[in-house]
Amino acid sequence: GFMSARYRPYRGLFNTPFWVEGWALYWEMLLWKLGFPETPENKMGMLFWRMHRCARIIFSLSYHLGTMTPEQCVDFLVERVRHERATADAEVRRSFNGSYPPLYQAAYMLGALQIWRMREELVDTGNMKEKDFHDALLKEGPIPIEMIRSIFAMQKLSADWQPSWRFYPGIEKSVAKKK
């Protein structure tokens, strides 16, 4: 897009669906929070597509872990999400035709949740204005979201730095306890 071409064009090499697809779903979530869907039909439509993206995580990971066949993935979309069979079949074929890496379908929701969590940490606490947050995110470009968080925090990264996926409050503490 315009911002990444203007500010950090070299970062296109590090493009990640967690940023690109996550950014799109993040906006859907923000529009929901701002009351954009006014009618019951609008609300149902937005919830349907959010459920669809959650289902992508389940069927994609299940398929790649060998616990679901493509046919079971189609059945899952028909029975749980209420897709028409032809639409579910096309979605599964599109997901597994070799054009997308295994975690691509999970990137929509997981990327959105990462951006949402970063927004909670920076905007909801008053540390950053919402417009500044969005502008800064776009200026940094499509790099891993945890890298953007470290840039915003002006954190110096060591050569052995490990990212932390912060998309659920308290997850870092519960993961640390298990180690």
Where are these regions (language model features)?
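N-terminal maturation segment of proteins
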Residues: 1-179
